[in-house]
Amino acid sequence: MKRFLFATLVALVFCAATGWAQSSTVINADGTVTFRYTNPQARDVQVDVQFAGRNPMKRGADGVWTATLGPAAPDMYPYCFVVDGVSVMDPLCPQYFPNEGFKNSLLEIPAREGSLAHDIKDVPHGKVEYIHYYSQSLQGTNNAIVYLPPSYYHEGNQQRYPVFYLISGTTDTEEVYYKVGRMNYILDNLVAQGQAREMIVVLPYGNPTKLLPTSPQGMGFGMDVFGNDLVGDLMPYVESHYRTINDADHRAIGGFSRGGNQGLSCGLTHLDKFSYLCSYSSFTSTTLPNVYDNADDTNSKIHLFWLGVGTDDFLYGTARDYMEFLDTKGIRSVKEYTHDKFGHTWMNAKYFLTKTFPLLFNPEASEQAMRNSQPALVATGNEQAFTPGVMARLFPRPIISPEFSASGVTFRMKAPEAREVQLQTELHARPLAMQKDDEGVWSITLTDHLTDVFKYCFLVDGTQVADPSNMYLSPDKGFKHSICNSPTNPYSLATMGNIPHGKVCYDLNAGTAQYLPPTGNPTVLIRLVAGPDDTPESWFKVGGADAIADKLLAEGKARPCILTTDAQAKATPGIKMKVRTLKASSYPSWPARRKALEKMLLKN
C-alpha cells in the first residue's frame, strides 16, 4: 500500500508539472497568426515558424509571451518556441512533427475560400494500419504504416490493388507522410473526385538500423541497407498479408528528400519490380549500373519517372543537375518546379503528391505526362547545392540520449546557457540534478528501473523540454514527454526476434485504435480506457499493448485477443468473446499499467 501511495504521489507531481505552461495560436482574419506562450520565469522567448523564421516574443505582465506574424498562406507549418536558447514544442498543440531529432508542433491555417488538398473532407476514407515485421536482412524487427483504400474492407470485396511505397526524409519517422504529409487525406479526396485510382500506400521507415540495439556486423547505413530490407523483407510481408497486384506495372516507389534518393536508387536498380518512380526534392546517384547507358531499355521499363523540386530548395542545384543528366542520357522524365513553398518543406511534399497520385497506375495519363515533359531548367550559376558544409549545418554531430548500457541508462541534454538542468520522470518523486560538462552537455545516469518503460523530460531552468535526441514521444494531450524504452524491457521489439505480429488500426478522427492479432480467432476483447492526459495512441505508443500481446501469444501464454481504446466496444454479435476493461486511471504509471495488461492477458 505504501508503495502504491508513493507512486500515486509521484504521478500527481509529474502530471501537475505538465499543466502550468499554457499557449495557443490564433488565426486572425487578415491571415496573420498570433502565437501565445505562458512561461513567467523565462528570460527570453522566440517563436520559430516555417513561414516567418525566428522572431522575438514580448512578455506581458501576466507572464504570457506573444508575437503576431504573417500573413501566411493557408497550409500546415512546423513551429516551436525557443525558451532561453532551448527549443520546446507548444504544450497545448495536439499536432506534432514525428521526427528522430527536432521537436516541432504543427500549425494548420485553413483555406479562407474553398479547400486544401489535404483537408479532412466528408468523403469515404481509407484505413491506416501500423505493422511490425521481422527483417532477415536487418536481423531485427522493423516498422511500417499501410494505408488501405476505402473499398478494401467492403464486405465480399476480393479486389487486388496496386502498391505505392512512399518514403519520408532524413530524420523523419515512418509517420511523417501520414501525420504531416497527410497522404491518406490527399488520396481519399482525389479518389472521391475521380482524379486518382484506389491503391495501397506503404510508408516504410527510412533509417531502419536506428531501431536495432546494434547494427549487424559489417553493415553501415546506405541505400543497400534500406533497399535490401524493402525488397527482401517489407515487400514480401505486404504481399503476403494484403491483397496486392504483384508485378512492376502495379508497383510504384518514391519519396521526399532522402526518401526520394532511396526510392530512385531502389527503383532504378529493380526495374523488374517498379515502373513508377517519383522523387520529391531529391536526386540519386548517376553511377547506378545498367541504368543510364542504355536509354531505350530503361525507358521501355518505366511508365512514369517524375521529379519535383522547389527552385528555393537547398537541394535545387543538385536536383536540377540530375534532371539535366537524365536529359543528356536520353532518359525520359517529368519535371515540376515550385517557387513559393519555402524550399525544402512538407508543403512541397504534399503538393507533389497532388500532382503524382493522378498519374500512378494510369498508363495513359503517365505516358501523356512523359511525352509533354520539358528539358531541365537552364543553370544560372546561382543555384543552391547540397555540399558537405550544408550537410554539417543541417545534421550536426548528434547527442546520444538515452544511451543504454549493462550498468545503467544515461540521459543527455545540450543546453550551454542553462543555469540548471534536471531529469524528471514519472517514477521518481523529485527531479534529479544533472551535471554539465565543458561542452555544455548535461547528463545523468540512472541505475534503477532499467527494464521499465516510462515517460520523462528535462527541466531546463524550470521549463519542461522533451529529449531532443529521442525519437520516441508520448502522444499526450498536453506537454509531450519522451519515452524511455530500454532494449532490456522484456517486450522490446528490438530484441523480440522473429515472431508473428498483429497490427494496430488507427482512426484518429474517431479517437480510436484497435489491435488485431496475427493469427487465430480472438476469444477476448479488452477495452483499454485512456487516462485523462492520454490519446488513443497512448496505450500502444507508451503502453506497448500490441508488443505485449504479440509476445505472449507467440509464447503460447495468452489467447488471441482484440485490444481497443473504444470504451464502449462490444463483442461481435454471434461470436462468444470475453469482454474485459482496463482503465489507465486505475494505475499510477505506465510500468504499472503495462504490468496490469500483462496480468490480464495471462489470465485470459
Locations of the language-model features?
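Positively charged n-region of N-terminal signal peptides that target proteins for export
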Residues: 1-4
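Bacterial N-terminal signal peptides
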Residues: 7-17
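A short hydrophobic/aromatic micro-motif that marks alpha-helical segments and, especially, helix-coil
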Residues: 17-18, 274
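Boundary at the C-terminal end of the N-terminal hydrophobic targeting segment
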Residues: 19-23
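Non-catalytic cap/lid and distal C-terminal segments of serine-dependent acyl enzymes
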Residues: 27-54, 59-382, 386, 393, ...
